[in-house]
Amino acid sequence: MQGLYIKSYGCQMNVYDSLIIENIIKPLGFSIVNEPSEADIVILNTCHIREKAAEKLYSELGRIRKIQETKNLTIVVAGCVAQAEGTEIFTRAPFVDIVVGPQSIHTLPELIVKARKIKKQIINIDFPVISKFDAIAVEEYTKNQKVSAFISVQEGCNKFCSFCVVPYTRGEEYSRTVEAIFKEALILADSGIKEITLIGQNVNAYHGTYKGNEWDLGRLIQHIAKISSIERIYYTTSHPRDMHESLYEAHGIEKKLIPFIHLPVQSGSNKILRKMNRKHTAEEYINIIKTLRKHRSDIAYSSDFIVGFPGETDEDFENTIQLIEEVKFSQAYSFKYSPRPGTPSAEYTSQIPDEIKSQRLTKLQELVHKQQLEFNKKMIGETHPVLFYKKGKFDNQIIGKTPYMQSCYINTENPDLYYNKIVPIKITDAHKNHLTGIIPNTLPV
């Protein structure tokens, strides 16, 4: 057996793609290894969302090149940086063998065999007519998932936010058929999966077909919920413009759909939202939150925020703070704006000094962390179902997550008894990033 090392950067879509890559390359005679030095093929599945993504790639490639100098090593750059940089990767890192975009990963077995045979660099960053989902048997991307699994239902984006590279690296919106998704869910359920996360760049823009009729995400969720052994359903990431009535209804009707939604707003300033080309206002976002609460009162919210977008004034930033205070988020991800080459906002004037960005980010994060801790503390004394999926750092410690996507730690003499199961846990303490709990005495062992 030869060694295969895969490093995945960024979002859940990349994690999912890396699983596909692993499962389609293993049959060529490879097994997964934990270090690049143990590998015969190294695959870097890259993300292009954050600042200096390309530079981080080249830095990692420099380290891997030293390994290549000591052995016959095939180096593959995949993902969104591969799509964005293209042949520039060969120019800056001529020792790379293969560059492949995220929509062409299904061609990797062929590319690897060819590159090793002809000893020449190969690139495939096309957006093929036949999608990777049509080209790969569904069984290949359901392997090796344990208690919780991703299903990609939608890829690409048609929104063209002025700061974002996704439409250029992942292509236009594409939705898989209901039949293909349901088949994948059934296979996962049969393998013991308890929780399914439906993923997409704009997952609530899903518009797949079933027997010639178009379905939206709300209807798809209720269909998947019919699988009895699937106990939890979650979806991410959503765009406010794509929230729709059947999705609201699913949150109210379908108890398997967890009471948590990640719904990025980015800014609370309508002026900045227009410059971002978000196609919604702060008021519309707040109305979405209110509508969700009408359907399920205990729902928790997460968001993304960008501070220091070009032209953001103190007043604009305070509008964001006011929105956060009104919504009260249980979690949030916040970043300083960084220009992405090729996006419209990279050319905007009125770029904000980094010092001001840092000050605003600190203030925003302090507020969000305060809200997060307050939300977690409300759980103390309550009992919640926790899905345990991994062992902790210490002996007898096991880690799970509540329906509100909070990490929960417990100590037990028999951690293996609860691993890969959903167990009622009484919450005894709360911290900013996690809860701790105990198994109630009434729970049969």
Swiss-Prot record:
Binds 2 [4Fe-4S] clusters. One cluster is coordinated with 3 cysteines and an exchangeable S-adenosyl-L-methionine. NCBIfam families: miaB-methiolase, MiaB/RimO family radical SAM methylthiotransferase. It holds the Pfam family TRAM. Residues 2-117 form the MTTase N-terminal domain. Keywords: 4Fe-4S, Cytoplasm, Iron, Iron-sulfur, Metal-binding, S-adenosyl-L-methionine, Transferase, tRNA processing. This is tRNA-2-methylthio-N(6)-dimethylallyladenosine synthase. Monomer. Its cofactor is [4Fe-4S] cluster. InterPro entries: Elp3/MiaA/NifB-like_rSAM (IPR006638), Methylthiotransferase (IPR005839), Methylthiotransferase_CS (IPR020612), Methylthiotransferase_N (IPR013848), Methylthiotransferase_N_sf (IPR038135), MiaB_methiolase (IPR006463), rSAM (IPR007197), rSAM_horseshoe (IPR023404). The gene is miaB. Belongs to the methylthiotransferase family. MiaB subfamily. Residues 377-441 form the TRAM domain. One of its GO terms (molecular function) is N6-isopentenyladenosine methylthiotransferase activity. [4Fe-4S] cluster 2 binds at C157, C161, C164.
